[in-house]
């Protein structure tokens, strides 16, 4: 992607929801290397899939010759963005937030290049807000914001209209903080463009207005669309839980499986959003899937590309190895690290501490059988295997020989149902 066509490329991918003064922004991007930023508040100890599109946008702009700033909200994270949130956020302690800031900085770093003429910048807004007192804030920033305009914003109106919730002055002031981030980054780094999710539009335009007032600079905003599944449900949830980017919170195997499960109606759109494959390559994949008469390849390609982007080549190979091993019932290739991934979140797990060693008991306790009677029936019908070997004998007791790497026993019932027994170390 060249810097002369970055906006057209993003539009072709469906990645632009809103932008300010599109003609002037396009002209600016074609005429110089532009510094842009996106903010990431530490609301948890990890980023999740909802952060991935704007994060990849920073990388897309950098590959087009522009300079990205990844701003971690050490200050704004202490307040909490109320935009389209139904209730007040819980306030976390400064120590907790500082720890989360460090983790998120480490997560952001691999996506960007910190070398070359357009080397990325990592910033923390606590650096300028931490020493600012309340009088400075009210005099230098607050006087430029109209309460009349602020309460008309849709995100604020939604909260004000709810008698059971309302909005605190703390959260109401959030847009002032984010607005000042833009002005500060413009002053420090010459930043001229802010990107974010479509729910950030009000905060972004507030920052544009403040930067114009404080710095007499024209700056721009661009948002990415809210990502939803084709059925209208929120994207980025697995069984109701967020899909985290931290491999200790969501294993690479679970991450890979999430993408394999993407619906046919969504997969080509997500290839445009979440990969760096060209539009032509994605169109070719879609055309081939429609004419092949076999299972579509798009989900596999999406899973490979997204897992490689977030977790790297080795983690992708491990996710593929685990997937193939479970599918083939041949566990010989699995490593201790692979089984640890499955123990984290890949399979139903039964902690064997305090459990008996009878196979029937393990089947019932793990949920592979509803009762001991049903467990007996499954064993008698040859539907149960232990570490890939068919179980025989109703009175079978698990021994040390059934423990992979001294810790794990993989039970299987039927063709697809697994449970992982984890023995005390």
Swiss-Prot record:
Pfam families: SYY_C-terminal (PF22421), tRNA-synt_1b (PF00579). SUPFAM superfamilies: Alpha-L RNA-binding motif (SSF55174), Nucleotidylyl transferase (SSF52374). InterPro entries: aa-tRNA-synth_I_CS, aa-tRNA-synth_Ic, Rossmann-like_a/b/a_fold, S4_RNA-bd, S4_RNA-bd_sf, SYY-like_C, Tyr-tRNA-ligase, Tyr-tRNA-ligase_bac-type. ATP binds at residue 237. L-tyrosine binds at residues 37, 174, 178. It is found in: Cytoplasm. Its EC number is 6.1.1.1. A motif ('KMSKS' region) lies at residues 234-238. A motif ('HIGH' region) lies at residues 42-51. Residues 357-422 form the S4 RNA-binding domain. Keywords: Aminoacyl-tRNA synthetase, ATP-binding, Cytoplasm, Ligase, Nucleotide-binding, Protein biosynthesis, RNA-binding. One of its GO terms (biological process) is tyrosyl-tRNA aminoacylation. One of its GO terms (molecular function) is tyrosine-tRNA ligase activity. GO terms for cellular component: cytosol. PROSITE patterns: AA_TRNA_LIGASE_I, S4. Its main location: cytoplasm. Signal peptide: none annotated. Catalyzes the attachment of tyrosine to tRNA(Tyr) in a two-step reaction: tyrosine is first activated by ATP to form Tyr-AMP and then transferred to the acceptor end of tRNA(Tyr). Homodimer. Belongs to the class-I aminoacyl-tRNA synthetase family. TyrS type 1 subfamily. NCBIfam families: tyrS. This is Tyrosine--tRNA ligase. It comes from Laribacter hongkongensis (strain HLHK9). The gene is tyrS.
